[in-house]
Amino acid sequence: MKRISLTLAIALAGCAPMAGGDDGHGKNVPAARADGAARNCVSVIALHDSEVRDYWTIDFHDHGKQWYRVTLPQRCNGLGNYRAFKYETSLSELCNTDIITVMEFGGPGGGPRGSCGMGMFQPVEIGK
């Protein structure tokens, strides 16, 4: 019984946040003010580019002046380092239920680095 308890305690310790550790929230993420109701999906045709801000945050910009901030429901490991991702959809929309795959480009061993669930698309005004 002691062996099982020790094994379980070690396994659970790996899931606990580290004291003083980096939680993946970037210190330089620009402030954003909500500008309307959050949306489940946005048209991929309307999206012009995206900016990965940290392990939790992606800002999408459409062809006009609209920005959408997606705060991922969980930290997406690798996203803050590689700052690149891909997605596949059979629809013409990217939705909060879709999965993104973190990508590493360049150098040997590049390629997919893990996948993460999306969040809601919050229309925002990005601060300077």
What do the predicted segments below correspond to?
Residues 4, 47-49, 110:
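Residues embedded in well-ordered secondary-structure elements
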Residues 17-74:
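N-terminal secretory signal peptides
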Residues 1-9:
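Sec-dependent signal peptide recognition
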Residues 11-14:
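C-terminal motif of bacterial Sec signal peptides marking the signal peptidase cleavage site
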